[in-house]
Amino acid sequence: MIETHIHLYSDEYAPDRALLIQNAIDIGVQKFYMPNVDVHSIAPVYAVEKAFPEHCFAMMGLHPCYVKEDYKEQLAVIEQELERRKFIAIGEVGIDLHWDKSFLTQQQEALQIQAEWALKYNLPIVIHSREANAESLEVLKPYMHRGLRGVFHCFSGSLAEVTVLKTYGWMIGIGGVVTYKKAGIDILIEEIGMGQLVLETDGPYLAPVPYRGKRNEPAYIDIVAQKIGDILHVSKEAVIEQTNANSRTLFGG
């Protein structure tokens, strides 16, 4: 399996990080893709990548919730990192209107800048869009026309938005929320099909049932794969095979 979105550098994993990673490897997780969130997470991301170089791979980007008054200074630091070394993707970036709408203009500008970087460095982009799919797509569509490729991680949206993403060949990241009864993700998955799905946990957040409300662990991605298989009436193994292929198409490797 390829875990396309997990914050392995989180302090919540500090007591047993190596054990949790090994547990996931033991059940078949081959790669873990780690999104950066701001300038302060860069060093922790690199530390985990250095400790597990065959399995853990860094993204680079500025998360929309960290787009504040100093966002231009943060973007300058992040751009320096992109110039200095290779990354698996630009991420995680996007628009988040759940907590605070006052920085929407700055979030839009930050997303535009980072979409340009994705094209410049020929990297996929990993989108965080919370209560902001219309706003995110408005910014992204011109770049999609120019060949920008990416994934909407932890996707929650409408069938119309699914259609837009499928039209541009974008991937859709599905995690533990698929196990929540009232989330309605099962209907979306039936519409998406396996051809554009990738697996994620978004750990340590959004643990699947029966661990909802607790720390999300990387091995729980197996639960996500099984649930998707149940929804689509295919085996877990078929889900893993196809989502691995989708991940390689997007991220390479």
Predicted segments, located by residue:
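Mid-domain alpha/beta scaffold segments of enzyme catalytic cores
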Residues: 1-253
